[in-house]
Regions:
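Positively charged n-region of N-terminal signal peptides that target proteins for export
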Residues: 1-3
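Bacterial N-terminal signal peptides
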Residues: 5-14
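Sec/Tat signal peptide C-region and signal peptidase I cleavage site
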Residues: 15-19
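Short, structured beta-strand-loop surface elements
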Residues: 20-21, 72-150
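Short, basic/aromatic recognition patches
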Residues: 23-34, 38-39
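Extracellular/periplasmic catalytic domains that process cell-envelope and extracellular macromolecules
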Residues: 32-33, 50-52, 59-60, 122, ...
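Short beta-strand segments
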Residues: 36-70, 87, 97
Length: 150
């Protein structure tokens, strides 16, 4: 029953996104995805050169997509972005964005990003009360550089 409910929810969301028609520009894409819970981040493997796909939490802020790497930045996708900062984001409704990644190191900005994640994601907020570092990873700004075909 849970699987059926989840499948129905995905179908409804996908149908609603598709009903809005094609994405006109980057601003339109950001507006459509901002309330989604996850997005697919597609990086190029730093060792293999192959496509590496990872669903990831994100926040849209100031026309940029913000993501965070857990494990103190020792995740494949984060290390891939350090080597090749150009990536692709895929979202529900056939939304595709080409992005350029920049790690965030300014302490004030990092703390602000952590607050945005805790505000958007209840799970991170609840776990933070128990000492979890979820929602407090190494932040990366993904600046949209255009819509993508694939």
């Amino acid at each position: 029953m849970r699987v059926l409910a989840a499948a129905l929810a995905v179908t409804v969301v996908a149908g609603a996104a598709a009903a809005k028609g094609p994405v006109s520009d980057v601003r339109d894409a950001l507006e459509r995805i901002k309330d989604d819970s996850t997005i697919e981040l597609v990086t190029t493997g730093r060792k293999t050169g192959k496509e590496h796909v990872r669903p990831i939490w994100f926040v849209v802020d100031q026309a940029k997509i913000l993501v965070q790497a857990g494990k103190d930045g020792k995740t494949d996708w984060y290390l891939n972005l350090l080597k090749n900062p150009e990536a692709l984001l895929r979202a529900v409704g056939n939304i595709r964005l080409r992005v350029r990644a920049t790690p965030v190191t300014d302490a004030k900005r990092v703390e602000g990003i952590h607050r945005l994640f805790l505000r958007k994601y209840m799970t991170a907020r609840l776990l933070s009360w128990f000492g979890s570092s979820i929602g407090r990873g190494k932040p990366v700004e993904l600046e949209p550089i255009g819509l993508a075909d694939r």
